Amino acid sequence: MGLEEKLPSGFVLTTVEQAAGWVRKSSVFPATFGLACCAIEMMTTGAGRYDLARFGMEVFRGSPRQADLMIVAGRVSQKMAPVLRQVYDQMPNPKWVISMGVCASSGGMFNNYAIVQGVDHIVPVDIYLPGCPPRPEMLLDAILKLHQKIQTSKLGVNAEEAAREAEEAALKALPLIEMKGLLR
């Protein structure tokens, strides 16, 4: 008898999800995890020439409790891996990760025991950004792609279950160093 009976199926929920997606993508707060030369390029995107503020990212947050995007920029050592995971766990949901540069994505040229061969074995990664180091324009493009992903993401209980399953699947994947024939 009400308005919801006259609307097509899924109309109201779709509209709410689109509005919430627009709000979430327009107010992403990044936390920096700059570990090497990629961090210099990441800092450049916040300067006047590239102006990251026009995408709703005014200030890089110093506290993970105030951030929902982690940009891992540079190589991650074995000693830094637990700290990276702790910072990720302290971030509120929903949270996203950009792996910036080949060192963060695959260990880069540092194929040894001290460097983690891909940050995706510590935290689930949403966007991989190649380059050594990637240009600020590439980081802006990755952020825009993440905005598209955020805007189309689902809300509610199903979203939490999907995020949990995706994180478990990402962390169970084989490290690159153990993939036979790939690095030899």
From Swiss-Prot:
Catalytic activity: a quinone + NADH + 5 H(+)(in) = a quinol + NAD(+) + 4 H(+)(out)
Pfam families (UniProt xref): Oxidored_q6
GO terms (BP aspect): aerobic respiration; electron transport coupled proton transport
EC number: 7.1.1.-
Cofactors, names only: [4Fe-4S] cluster
Binding-site residues, [4Fe-4S] cluster: C37, C38, C103, C132
Family: Belongs to the complex I 20 kDa subunit family.
Function per UniProt: NDH-1 shuttles electrons from NADH, via FMN and iron-sulfur (Fe-S) centers, to quinones in the respiratory chain. The immediate electron acceptor for the enzyme in this species is believed to be a menaquinone. Couples the redox reaction to proton translocation (for every two electrons transferred, four hydrogen ions are translocated across the cytoplasmic membrane), and thus conserves the redox energy in a proton gradient.
Stated name of the protein: NADH-quinone oxidoreductase subunit B 1
Species assigned in the record: Streptomyces griseus subsp. griseus (strain JCM 4626 / CBS 651.72 / NBRC 13350 / KCC S-0626 / ISP 5235)
Gene: nuoB1
